[in-house]
Amino acid sequence: MRHGNGLRKLNRTSSHRLAMLRNMCNSLIQHEAIKTTVPKAKELRRVVERLLTLGKTPTLANKRLAFDRLRDRDNVVKLFGVLGPRYAARPGGYTRILKMGFRVGDNAPMAFVELVDRPDPSAAVEVTEDKA
């Protein structure tokens, strides 16, 4: 019986699913917004919320746990140096899932996953234009 097992299998083996979620977590932490399908976005939210909660308390044990899950040193540094302090006062709900229609090839429902309170990308473009 599968009572209490709420994990979506996403039609993948366990190793493929783990690698896919790890790659999506790394992309979301690096770019702070990604585009994916709705079921993948909902599973990604579960994993990323826990990682961002780890990032709020920068202990050595938490850094090792985050590195064990991400396997990317730059993203672990960003998680504890940038994202952790940004969300220190927020008690959860670090991600936002916006539905954005259907994919052209197979009509799969697509979603835009982003971190809330992220810097506006248009503001960064304006700053670089002023310097040039």
Swiss-Prot record:
Part of the 50S ribosomal subunit. Contacts protein L32. The lineage of its organism: Bacteria, Pseudomonadati, Pseudomonadota, Betaproteobacteria, Burkholderiales. InterPro entries: Ribosomal_bL17, Ribosomal_bL17_CS, Ribosomal_bL17_sf. Keywords: Ribonucleoprotein, Ribosomal protein. It comes from the Bacteria. It comes from Leptothrix cholodnii (strain ATCC 51168 / LMG 8142 / SP-6) (Leptothrix discophora (strain SP-6)). The gene is rplQ. GO terms for biological process: translation. One of its GO terms (cellular component) is cytosolic large ribosomal subunit. Belongs to the bacterial ribosomal protein bL17 family. One of its GO terms (molecular function) is structural constituent of ribosome. The keyword Ribosomal protein applies. PROSITE patterns: RIBOSOMAL_L17. It holds the Pfam family Ribosomal_L17. This is Large ribosomal subunit protein bL17.
